Amino acid sequence: MSTLDKIFEEINKAESIVILTHENPDGDAVGTSLALYNALKLYGKNNVDVIIPECPKTFNFLPGSSEIKKESNVENYDLAIAVDCASFDMLNGLSKKFEDATTTVVIDHHGTNNMFGDYNFVNPDAPACAEVMIVALSAFKLEINKEIGTCLLVGIITDTGGFKYQGVTAETFEFVAGLLRKGVNVSDTYRKVLQVKTKSAFELTRAANNRIEFFEDGKIAYTYVTLEDYEKFNAVAGDHEGIVDIGRDIEGVEVSIFIREIKGKGLKVSLRSNDKVNVDEIALLYGGGGHP
């Protein structure tokens, strides 16, 4: 029996299911979580929760987003599924929900994943967890309709930077073609996720732009935002999305570094690279992880 067969067996057995993802979730985390949530509900699993304590408002248009919970009083779920999460520690405040579940599953695409579930379906060659989820849902023979497809597309668009990051393959576009056939509006979704910004997000991005510094003969770009910036511009979770990519888009830059201050939690460092530097290995040295 394959790993996916075993996971689907656990899904069928479970009376209660919780879907979790990493803190400070991006579009791949939110989109893939909601795709699974919607697919399981459509399949007839009624007792399913998706918990995302701080979901960026950018993704409020996604089907099922109104059902996202900030917390849950359920102590012991039959099945916990961690999505787009490379390690147990990345679950942060939700780690106990995962740990206390009868059975745990991990669905992910990070090469640094430490296989922390009872069952792990991980493909480090996939540029987005949404691609891994498409494979899983197809293996489960669960329907991918327009609504679920929209959630999956958000995941792919986000983690590929609009199809411009390394790791994008012919299969990526084949997956997107399949979603198009389901009626998903690619141009509208792309615009909502990557092009439309709130005024607060625009101001936060402008502040970061004004602080960019270069090192190593212009090969490294660095910028940051502070708690004071968040307060000044009334910025919220998710408003920082895309800032780390600004430096990488500048000619000659190989590595972009973005640091943001998080209230009560210190500093969060994000790294992005072009082809020559594997930044996930650098992040791993400091307890982080991810992909180039």
Each PLM stretch: what is its role?
Residues 2-23, 31-60, 70-77, 158-292:
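Hydrophobic helix-and-loop "lid/oligomerization" segment in the mid-to-C-terminal part
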Residues 24-25, 85-88, 110-112, 227-228, ...:
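Short glycine-rich anion-binding loops that position phosphate/pyrophosphate groups of nucleotides
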Residues 107-175:
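Short alpha-helices
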Residues 63-119:
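Active-site cofactor/cluster-binding pocket
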